[in-house]
Every structure is written in structure tokens, then in C-alpha cells.
Regions:
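Outer membrane beta-barrel translocator domains of Type V secretion systems
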Residues: 30-212
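Short, intrinsically disordered, charge-balanced linker/junction segments flanking boundaries
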Residues: 1-3, 56, 62, 226-227
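Extracellular, surface-exposed repeat/solenoid domains
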Residues: 1-34
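Aromatic-anchored, glycine/proline-accented short structural segments
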Residues: 208-227
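A generic alpha-helix propensity feature with a strong bias for hydrophobic helices
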Residues: 9, 42, 217-220
Length: 227
């Protein structure tokens, strides 16, 4: 048998490869009842599950920018940020993998001529790359390209603020799978996503330039499925 491990990949699942004597000096091989998700199925599931964390992780640069606006009293202009994130998905979810994300965003914002300069609007764009490690020699990559628009409202006297963002993504997904017979296989697909986030909080200044910023956030994203 060419299998490098005592298992056989059969579609969605990998089955334990078992054997017994055929009674004539030979060996009979068969697939046992013990099964788990195959590397190829794991890679596809991980790639699709990663899209929301990719989308949300990219917001870290925008949240940093909006925090800067609040700290600097709403000084608008052109900005650029790089960022990095790590996510560990545990086995309890049914699919364990590690995700490492890095990317950059750039944008520009300006105050609206209403509300005494309390409102600002802006646009952003950027790209990120997420590397997935699914163990057993299987990995994946998600390259993301995005554009979006955002607005923020800040009341300087009270410190209350509202942030909102709408972001569109295009994802390039690629899987590198190590099969049970030692052969490596590759696959890729593209899909898109659209999401929005809103945050409400308060910027509370303390002595010596310190501050605290309690907030509540709600976010949602819709990811295009693929057959």
C-alpha cells in the first residue's frame, strides 16, 4: 500500500486502515469504523470559517485610526496603518487550526459641515494575508482585498462617540493538502463578503494623559458560499 499513514481519505472523511488474515496466509485490508474529517475537507471548512475573522481582524487598523481621532480632537486627514493578528481555533469547535494575519490599510477622512464638526466621514482600502496551519502537512492561505466607508461622531464635552463602518471584501482562498498516500493536492476559489460594524462608547480622560474607553460593539458579515 502507498499510504504513508494507517488511514485512507475517502471524500469528506479519513478512515482507519485495518487488516486481518484471510485464513490462507494472506492479508485482507478494510476501512474501519473510526473516522474523522479528512485533510481536504478540513482545509475547505477552515478557509470558509476564516473569512469572518479575516474581515473582523482588518478592522483593527480602522479602530486605531478612530481612537486617534478621538485622542487628537478630531484632526482629520490621510492615514495608513499596518497590523497583525493571531487566532487559535480549538478542537472543541470540531476543526482546529491556527491563523496568522498581517496586512495594511490606508484611508482619508474629513469633517462634515454639520453638527459643529462633530461628524467625520472617511474611506479606506487595503489588503491582508492569512496563513492557516491545520497540522498533518495541510495548510491554507486567504488573501483579502477590501474597500469601505466609515463615519464617526464625537461629542468633545461629554466624550461620547459613535463609530460605524461598511466594508466590502474579495477573498482569494488556496488550500495545500497532504493526502493519506503522501500525494499533495492544491485547490483554490474566490468569494466575496460584505459586512458592517457599529460601536458606541465614551472617551474618559484621566490625569497625566491617561484615559479609559468603555464601549459596546455589534458587527455582522455575510460571506458568499461556493459549491
Amino acid at each position: 500500500l502507498a499510504n504513508a499513514a494507517p488511514r485512507v481519505d475517502q471524500g469528506t472523511y479519513s478512515y482507519a486502515l485495518e487488516s486481518k488474515s484471510d485464513g490462507a496466509g494472506g492479508t485482507e485490508w478494510f476501512l474501519g469504523a473510526n473516522k474523522h474529517i479528512s485533510p481536504s475537507a478540513s482545509s475547505v471548512l477552515a478557509l470558509f470559517n476564516t473569512a469572518p475573522t479575516v474581515w473582523y481582524g482588518e478592522l483593527s487598523s480602522l479602530r486605531s485610526r478612530m481612537g486617534e481621532l478621538r485622542f487628537d480632537g478630531g484632526q482629520s486627514g490621510v492615514w495608513m496603518r499596518s497590523y497583525g493578528n493571531k487566532f487559535n481555533v480549538s478542537e472543541s469547535t470540531g476543526l482546529a487550526y491556527k491563523q496568522t494575519q498581517h496586512g495594511f490599510s490606508l484611508g482619508a477622512d474629513a469633517p462634515l459641515p454639520i453638527g459643529d464638526g462633530q461628524w467625520l466621514v472617511g474611506v479606506l482600502g487595503g489588503t491582508s494575508k492569512s496563513d492557516l496551519d491545520l497540522s498533518r502537512g495541510t495548510s491554507g492561505t486567504v488573501k483579502s482585498y477590501y474597500v469601505g466607508a466609515y463615519t464617526t461622531w464625537l461629542d468633545q464635552s461629554s466624550g461620547y462617540y459613535v463609530d460605524a463602518v461598511l466594508k466590502f471584501n474579495r477573498f482569494n482562498n488556496e488550500a495545500n493538502v497532504s493526502m493519506s498516500d503522501g500525494v499533495r493536492a492544491k485547490g483554490s476559489y474566490d468569494n466575496v463578503g460584505l459586512g458592517a460594524s457599529a460601536e458606541f462608547g465614551r472617551h474618559i480622560k484621566l490625569d497625566d494623559g491617561y484615559f479609559i474607553e468603555p464601549f459596546a460593539q455589534v458587527a455582522g458579515v455575510v460571506i458568499q458560499a461556493k459549491d
